[in-house]
Structures are given as structure tokens and as C-alpha cells.
Amino acid sequence: MAKKLGKSPVAKEEDKEGLFASCSFTDLGLHPTLCAHLQDKMGFQAPTRIQAQAIPVAMSGQHMLVKAATGTGKTLAYLAPIVHLLQMREPRVERTDGTFALVLVPTRELCLQVYGIAQQLVHRFHWLVPGYIMGGENRAKEKARLRKGISILIATPGRLLDHLQHTSSFVYPNMRWIVFDEADSILELGFGKALEDILEHLGSRNDTSNQNKNKMEPMKRQNLLLSATLNEKVNRLAKISLKNPVMIGLDEQNSSAHGKNHTSLLSDDEEEILEKHNVTVEQAVDDFKLPAQLVQRYVKVSCGSRLAILLTILKSLFERQLSHKVVVFLSTCDSVDFHHTVLSQLEWSPGLQLDTDKKQKFISCKVFRLHGNMDQDDRKKSFLGFSSEKSAILVSTDVAARGLDFPKVKCIIQYDSPGEASEYVHRVGRTARIGEKGEALLFLQPIETDYLRDLELHGASLTEYPLQKVLDSFPVNGQRLHKRKQISLDMHPWIMSLQRALESFVTSEDTTKKLARDAFCSWVRAYTAHRGELKKIFMVKKLHLGHVARSFGLKEQPSLLGRSHQVQLKKRKKEQKRERPAKRRKIPAKR
């Protein structure tokens, strides 16, 4: 039978309806200096409910599995107790002792973010040294930092495994903590085998065949696994990395209904652990928990008007509130590059009078981009730049959808559909974080509205965005018309004028036109890649490719074949023509 944890005084004081617990960080047992720093310098007045449950468990030394909604403070839930325990260690931790805590994250941007939080946490404990290693960075410089010693190491799996295999100066015999942050994302990115190899190297795999190889005492190593969603891959990772773990947030609805504490300790029987995890996975897949303060909307637009309406909504947002941060999610890297160019460079005349010389930027704020094909330096600049701005737009692929906590993001626009409902949850999780208000907007074509039913099945309910009202608020040719007949969005004067401006901008330069063509081709390829039941909703056969081209500011539909393919196709047709037997001319008979 699974052993139950008694309900702590802290848990009794929790505000069950809200995000925050009614206790303080001091009540959780953290060092007074660390608590004062959290409140005075980092601005954390009270722990979230997840932090109130996880921090005491993390300090107890037990393995832990945490399932919590995005934006609930999972990073602090493991970093704060690690810093607390390290600063108390006697004799004092030195750099030559090597690495004590390892945090594994899925992306480079999340690596930088966790490193930044760790830096702030150890500010008053100067002998603790955080550091990071990740793909794209200079390996020799990382090797030098590892040689000097890093107390708290944040890493992406691929680069960590590389150093474990090839960097002899990497000192980790004292490693006490291994943290899997955003574990579901790590596994979805294909790092499952790398994680198993890492656990083998560090002697933390729960295989009986490896017990004799493990030189460390089993009780000295504590593994923590944190995830916003659960699936079979996460289940397997938990089975091989966690031993008798404390479970947090996995069965809140069930436990509350029975009046039981939802934090429980499992038995040593791995089959029982697996069975318990499977039950939890089935429950978790059916429903996703989203912040109550998140306003979710959808906008239904025809394909050809998508770009003009995106620009209109962004302009409306920034005119409504000057200090605004927005993340726009797109499906491909090429699409990100194209839309970044349009948003940052498109100029227009007041009232969209194209014949006037007085022009200004359509979007006045800074625009950043983020995707996996960018150079590491450019990715870092974009991530840090957008984080530091008070008013900005970030256009990004799903590389920014997991774990990243951009300050003060008020709106998420899913311009391209996320596909799986779990991805929708991760995207909208970039706003309405830690109790703050936020809004999320999903673009859908008329042929895609069945996707709303799929989201409803997973607990996400969206209302329609008042697009007509927003369009009518903009003047055309310097005049604001007060009475307008109900017309289709495609024929709206504002949309028609803006579409002409977009097509003029895109076709004015060859470089911009090439960006648009590449974005068009990659978008169509991505649209065909939807899996399972979603293929019935997102059917490429139902698309009008001419209208898709229009959504990239193109007047004509580009060929979906590359230039080399076109040349080969023409060559093949010529060869086939030559190989055909020549037709005999019919000579009319003489009469």
C-alpha cells in the first residue's frame, strides 16, 4: 500500500481557490536570509500553492514528481530548496568540489532563464556558483568553466552528455540533485535516449543490473521531475529515474473529492508505481488546467485576409495600451523570418493614403524573432532583448512555448494552429502567469472551426473576438465612417487598403518576395503534417492555395516544387516526348 503524508499546517492554510498559499516562505523552512532576498530583491511576497507543497518535500531529500499548470512557479519550487541546503552545508561549498545540482531543460532559452533565476537566488551566498552549458555555445569555454567548478549546473541534454563523455575535468562525484524541468518537452524533442545515457553515467538509473555499478550511496542522490503535462514517455522516465517518489499535483480533483491530501508517497514496488502513474496519465490527458484569469478567444478569418487582420489586431492592442508585450506563434522558421520582416519594416501613410509621402511604421514597437535555425548569439539577443523590453512583439515557433517566463506578456496570438491540445496549453501558458491577467487569441479559418470542439473536450473554452468592432474603429483615407453596412471582412475598406499596402511592400524587393515564397511553401508543408484526428480538421485539400499566397502578400501562387525539381520535371517531359514514336502523317487519298 502507498504510504500517505500527513497534511501539514502549511497545507491547511492554503487558499484552495487561488494560486497563492496563505503561508510565507519562512513557514516553509527556508533560511531567513534567502526568504528576505526572495521578498525584498526578487519581489516574491508569498509562495504559490505548488511551491508550498513542493519546497518542504524537496528539502526532505525524497524523490519528487510534480505535475503543475504552466506559470505556477515550478522553477523556484526546486531552486529555492537547493540553494537553502547548499548554503547550510558544512564545510562551506567550494568551486573545486564540482557540481552539486544538475538541472536539465529542453531548450537554450529556458537554460538561460533558469540560470538567471539561479544567479539571483545565490546573490547573498557568493560562494555558490551557478553556470550553464548548452548547444550552440563554445565548447572549449564551457570546458574551462566546468574545470573551475560550477555548483548549480543548468544544461540541455545533448551538450551535457557530450561533456560527460569527453570532458575529464567535469567533477560531479558530489552531485546530490538531478532535476528534470519541463520533462514532457525534453522527451518530445527526442532526448529520451540521451536522458537514459545521462542517468547511466551519473549512476542514477533504477535498474537492478546497475546497482553494483553505482559508486554513490543511494540516499545521497535526490531526483526531481517536473512537468506541465503527463504522457507515457514521462511515465517511463519517472519509472527509471525516481525511487519511491512523493507525488504532487497528479490527482487533485480525485483527492479533493475524497478529502485526502493529493500529495502521497508511493511504495517501493515499481509495478505499483507504474500502475499509479498510468491512472494519473489517463486523468491528466482528459483535461488541462488553465489559469482562471486567462481570457481565451478565437477569431474566424478567411485565409486571404489573415495577415491584414493580424496586423490590425496588433495595432489595436498597442493603441489600446502603450506598454504591451505580445507573443505571436507561427508554425515554421521561414514564416517567422517573413512575418518579422513585415512587422518591423512595413511603413504606411496615416489613413492608408498610399499616394502621400508622409509615412510611418505600421507597428511602432520593437519586434523580435525566435526559432531553432537562428545562430545561438542571435537567439540569445532576441530572448534577452524581448525579456527586457516594456513594449515589444516576439514572433516565434514553438521553441518559446515551453517553460519560458517572459515578464509582463499580456497577450498570446496563435496565428498558426498549435495542433495537439497540449501544445495549445503550453503556448497560452506564456501569459497569465503567477496570478497576473492575460489574454490568448487563436486564429482559425472557417474550415477549421471544429478544432474548437477538440479544445473544449480538454477543458479549454473560447469566445469569439469582436473583430468587426475593431475594424470599424480604424479610419480609411483619413476619415472614420460612423455607419457601415454589414459586409464581409474581405471586402472591408480597411482590410482592402491594408492588403494593397502589404502586397506593394512584399513585391517591392526581391529579398522580401523570396522570404514570402519560402514562408508560403514551408507553411503548406507544415499544414499537411497534422496527425491523427486533426487531419480531418486541417485538410490541405480544402485550402485555396491562391488565398494562402495572398496571406503572405503574394499576388500569385508560388510553385510548391523547388527550382531544381522544376528543371528536372521539364527535362523529364522533354525526354519522354523524344522517346514517343513519331506519329505518321495521314496523307489524304487522291480522288
From Swiss-Prot:
Q: Which domain of life is it from?
A: Eukaryota
- Domain Helicase ATP-binding, first and last residues per copy: 55-248
- The keyword ATP-binding appears for this protein: yes
The EC number(s) given in the record are 3.6.4.13
What gene is this protein translated from? RH17
Q: Motif DEAD box, which positions?
A: 181-184
Q: Where is this region: Disordered?
A: 562-591
Name-wise, this protein is DEAD-box ATP-dependent RNA helicase 17
What is this protein for, i.e. what is its function? May play a role in organellar ribosome biogenesis and suppress 16S rRNA maturation.
Q: What residues bind ATP, as annotated?
A: 68-75
What is the scientific name of the source organism? Oryza sativa subsp. japonica
Query: What is the similarity comment for this entry?
Result: Belongs to the DEAD box helicase family. DDX31/DBP7 subfamily.
